[in-house]
Every structure is written in C-alpha cells, then in structure tokens.
C-alpha cells in the first residue's frame, strides 16, 4: 500500500534545504519505481520521535545519524548508503564536527576549554558530542547542556549559556548561509 509507505530525510531540514531534499527524494523515488519498487510520492513530515519513525514497519527510506544507527538501529534497519555532502576536508561520504565558541572568547584552542560549559544537541548524536568525545574526551569534563538541536547549541554559545559546542559541519554550513553564526568562530574540526 503506497499510501501507508513513509520516507524522510530528517537530518537536514532548514528552510534552505527543503528544495534540495525534495529533489533528492524525487530522484530516489523515481529510481526505486524504475527498479520495480513502490515508493511514496512525497517525503513525510519530520516526526518528533525519530526512533519510533525509524522503526516504523511502513518506513521505506530515511536517514539517521551514525550513533543511533550503531547503538540501536543496526539490527532493525538496513544501511544502503551514505550521502556525500561535500564537507571540506573530508573524503566522499564522510563528515566532521566543528567545535565552535564565541569569537570574543580569549581561549583559542580546544584544550583551553577544559573544563568549560559544553552544549550538545542530543545524547544520541555522533556529531553533537560523540565524535569529539572519541577524539578528546578530557575536554568534555565540565558542565553539559543538552539543547535539543544544533541550532539551539549555536544559540546557547552565542548567548553565553554555554562556552562551546560541537556542530555537524553540514548544519554549520546551513546556519552560515542563513546568517545565524554571527559572533562565533570554529576552534577545532574533528577527524573525518
């Protein structure tokens, strides 16, 4: 039943990406149909409970952050590919986190932020904290603030509620394009 099938691209949904996501889905959908597979006409709205969404039996296609896939979804869904968002300094299909701070903060190295207030988007986020924790765990020994989104982490740093945050490089690019990164600087980039 095509009407019950769902598809989503929930990782990058700012207004600037809506058209690109729709075009990407149209290409995927058309390829699926050419290959004899049913596919919904349009993307489903991004749900508030992504874990339930990703486990929905009606799910045909979606994307997830790496940490939820490795930690909980790998036995429930099939990984069919990794998109290439052409992140600077990364091979095709890879990404990195950018560690940001206020531009007027005198600390200019990641080590100088130990311990400091760290904002992260979600406990199940590879880019929001896990990539940084795997690379330099000592820097995350200070207070932490879960913000609910990369955009909210950026805002927390801008407003001085947090001293630094790790932001997905693709999201950072979207936020820069939308003019939402004023007063911030990148102090570190994680390994791809």
Predicted feature residues:
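Periplasmic-binding protein-like
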Residues: 6, 81, 89, 95-98, ...
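Short, surface-exposed beta-edge/turn micro-motifs
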Residues: 56-59, 95-97, 115, 192
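Alpha-to-beta junction loops
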Residues: 55-62, 116-118, 158-167
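Bilobed "Venus flytrap"/periplasmic-binding protein-like clamshell domains
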Residues: 7-27, 91-154
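Local beta-strand N-terminus motif with an aromatic residue
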Residues: 57-58, 77, 110-113, 141, ...
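Generic preference for hydrophobic
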Residues: 61, 79-80, 99, 118, ...
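Pocket-lining segment of extracytoplasmic ligand-binding domains
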Residues: 124-192
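N-terminal hydrophobic or amphipathic helices and topogenic motifs
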Residues: 1-76, 82-85, 92-94
């Amino acid at each position: 039943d095509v009407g019950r099938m769902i598809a989503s691209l929930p990782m990058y949904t700012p207004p600037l990406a809506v058209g690109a996501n729709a075009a990407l889905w149209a290409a995927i959908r058309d390829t699926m149909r050419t290959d004899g597979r049913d596919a919904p006409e349009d993307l489903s709205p991004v749900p508030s409970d992504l874990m339930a969404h990703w486990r929905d039996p009606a799910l045909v296609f979606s994307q997830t952050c790496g940490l939820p896939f490795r930690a909980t979804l790998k036995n429930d869904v099939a990984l069919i590919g990794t998109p290439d968002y052409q992140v600077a300094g990364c091979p095709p299909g890879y990404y990195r986190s950018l560690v940001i701070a206020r531009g007027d903060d005198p600390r200019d190295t990641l080590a100088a932020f130990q311990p400091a207030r760290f904002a992260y988007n979600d406990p199940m986020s590879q880019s929001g904290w896990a990539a940084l924790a795997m690379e330099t765990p000592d820097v995350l020994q200070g207070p932490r603030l879960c913000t609910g989104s990369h955009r909210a982490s950026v805002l927390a740093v801008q407003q001085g509620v947090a001293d630094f945050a790790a932001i997905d490089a693709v999201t950072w690019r979207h936020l820069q394009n939308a003019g939402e990164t004023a007063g911030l600087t990148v102090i570190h980039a994680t390994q791809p």
